[in-house]
Amino acid sequence: MVKLDIGECKQTTTGVVGCIQYIDHFGNLVSNIPASYVQGKTWYVQADGLSIPSCETYSDVKVGEVVALVGSHGWVEIAINSGNAHSKLQLDWQETLQVILT
């Protein structure tokens, strides 16, 4: 197995900049930003000109809505409730995203 270096996320004055580290089999875009940066805070994600609101669970939003949340592996991810974020948003591995703390 070859391990690819995607770099580490970096704190900014408004939040954290990271990238998509992998795309899971559901099409969720999993970032390299750990949950510890957003837990207990109000936040959203900016990626490719989109502002994506955060939520706690998929049931917090309607089917088909784009959301940012902490996934089961402890990373911030972009997902679509009952959908495929990778296909719909056309974002790919290593693309930059930013968590904005509000």
Each predicted region: which residue ranges?
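A conserved acidic, glycine/proline-rich C-terminal tail/linker
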Residues: 30-90
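A residue-level signal for beta-strand positions that form part of recognition/binding surfaces
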Residues: 17, 66, 96
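Surface-exposed interaction regions enriched in Ser/Thr/Asp/Glu
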Residues: 93-102
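Anionic-ligand-binding alpha/beta catalytic cores of soluble enzymes and soluble regulatory domains
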Residues: 1-32, 37
